[in-house]
């Protein structure tokens, strides 16, 4: 309510202008008796046109301290860094055959991807803590520099072993860049605008999924596979220098903590237990049933170590809560190449419907969430559509028409683009500011871990099911299929055998698609059960609530310190 003065003006009509723009100032925190005289004077001296009936929403600190052009430039540089990391995940696929020919290292093929994924996944949670206690710009620039050095090592690698080491280092840097891009956005962009930006992040991954294999194939064919890594140097160098010079991130409450206290907060003991835990799990899933039998001593030992370290890590998180840290697109090219008989390049073209629709869904979903505010409706709708698309993919047969598989992929891509933003927006809207870095790191870790686990599970399911289906071929052995590759194995068969073998391949791949369908279906109730909150909600921790003309000056004192 506003109190009336002798001249008819209301106290609440003049004061909120300053408090809405500047936040809760020191003067607004003084007692009413001490500030009454100055407020009366301000009311009398303010012309009527200076006291609008409705004030604009308060701007967060990031909009006051940096211009829109500078924030746009910084976002472009951050997106460039994310582009490099995303490109690094897709550009290598077409270069691997040439790499193995040069190094005579067919047995190391799995390590070129696994070394990167193991370190990227294992260090994800640690970086959530690092960004909580240390300067965001310093950590981000350091990881970008590490990624650049690792790319140079990979490009100049004289042997397969050096290349694997370089990939492992690149994974560590990529983990820091993954976490840093989202966390930097939290401090640069107001919550109500973040859905649009996260839509751009999704578009970056979609673009690199399309361009990565094409760029890698072009370098490998026309220049050398080493340029798949060298390309990171000039692009990343520009981003690194510009971010180091221009990025400004507000100080966090933990900035002034002693170094020893920051290190204690990193949960180094938990990390030391967690990293071997995840490595043992991923190695067991990658090797089990393919390189080694599930009953072999190595696989059993890996699973035992994983189980023990997981229990220890869970105990550490439970008893030390103050420091605790807690696949259709992969197999579709194989379906196109084996069942539909297209080339590797053509299979990449056939993925365009799902990639383009995912980009469109991501961008449109971002703008929709920013406009409406509530992210849950689109998340539930998107996950439902994604599940329908996954169900249609599961029904693929040898004679599935072009229109049907294109429509199925479009549905899957649209649903994926609409729903993938929800977890990131949920933690930014619901959690306290100090908890957001760890929560975002946890989300990214779970995504990377799920990718590693279920791709390995899918590999095992396909190899096992295909070997069982093809056992009718005279002299066939499972090792023959894994050593020669699915496509090469088909070409070695007679025409009559090939027709039946293609049916067997399709049956095996449908088992893999069933895994994706189940995972998509599980997402629907999970997203539907999330608390409905709006990114425009009043009192978001990084934006001060808009002042209303009827607010009393004393009500501005109720703004919590963490909202400033």
From Swiss-Prot:
- List the subcellular locations: Membrane
The transmembrane residues are: 71-91, 106-126, 138-158, 169-189, 199-219, 227-247, 265-285, 299-319, 348-368, 376-396, 405-425, 438-458, 470-490, 512-532
What the entry lists under Pfam families is as follows:
MFS_1
Protein topology in the membrane: Multi-pass membrane protein
Q: Keywords for this entry? A: Glycoprotein, Membrane, Transmembrane, Transmembrane helix, Transport
Q: Which GO terms describe its cellular component?
A: plasma membrane
Show the CDD domains listed in the entry.
MFS_Azr1_MDR_like
Question: Where are glycans found on this sequence?
Answer: 222, 469
GO molecular-function terms, A-Z = transmembrane transporter activity
Positions with biased composition (Basic and acidic residues) = 47-57, 539-564
- Output the superkingdom of the source species: Eukaryota
Q: Where is this region: Disordered?
A: 1-61, 534-564
Tell me which PANTHER family the record gives: AFLATOXIN EFFLUX PUMP, PUTATIVE-RELATED (PTHR23501:SF153), MAJOR FACILITATOR SUPERFAMILY (PTHR23501)
- What is the stated purpose of this protein? MFS-type transporter; part of the gene cluster that mediates the biosynthesis of the dimeric xanthones cryptosporioptides.
Q: Which family does it belong to?
A: Belongs to the major facilitator superfamily. TCR/Tet family.
Q: List the protein's name.
A: MFS-type transporter dmxR4
| Species this protein is from | Cryptosporiopsis sp. (strain 8999)
What does the organism's lineage look like at the top? Eukaryota, Fungi, Dikarya, Ascomycota, Pezizomycotina
